[in-house]
């Protein structure tokens, strides 16, 4: 198989900051994603709709954020993780390659954090490739249970001989994910990277 260029990005619902000083970043995010020139982009905290923010920001996109952010010619897949008073948000995948199928599984571990995984099957050079986008919990015991669920999901839903990629926001700075998933045959990407967390508002 040829090289597959992949990016993952928690877009924080397309908004930077909190309260009355928050600013709309979704248009800048669209430019950044175009510059990635990635075959696959895995996104977390993606708004499908948010009525309050759409009323607050003059240039709030008319399209759901996944469709708005997809570069020309890309396929956009979105599934909701969380329903709120004013809208809903979840994970998304943008793919240069055709999407054969997709599904969602709830990974919420407690009532304060609604989490889920988005599983898409892509056709890359005539080879089915499975991509799973996750956003794990903030609390370590929750992440451990979610990783156990992810292992079970892969064993159940992904053929043992199929290429599979897991990407997303792991909320993990101590290699917990790599250790927990090693037994599933997954390998950590060891290329150059730079930390994006901790930060005041990452």
Predicted regions and their residues:
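Beta-strand-turn-beta hairpins that frame and shape the catalytic cleft
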Residues: 1-6, 89-91, 95-101, 113-133
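Residue-level detector of structured alpha->beta connecting loops
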Residues: 37, 73-74, 96-98
